[in-house]
Amino acid sequence: MNGDNPSPNRPLVTVVYKGPDFYDGEKKPPVNRR
């Protein structure tokens, strides 16, 4: 929410890393992130 780098880069890597889990992680607590 600061620049255009961490915004499209963060969700892109997460989506490819966890796939559909990315959307679930946004609503759920950062369990896989930690």
Swiss-Prot record:
Induction notes from the record: Expressed in both exponential and stationary phase in rich medium; expression is higher in exponential phase (at protein level).
Highest rank taxon of the organism: Bacteria
InterPro entries in the record: MgtT
Annotated segments matching region Disordered: 1-34
Biased composition (Basic and acidic residues): 24-34
Other remarks in the entry: This gene lies just downstream of mgtS on the same strand in another reading frame and is encoded antisense of the mgrR small regulatory RNA gene.
Protein's UniProt name: Protein MgtT
Organism expressing this protein natively: Escherichia coli (strain K12)
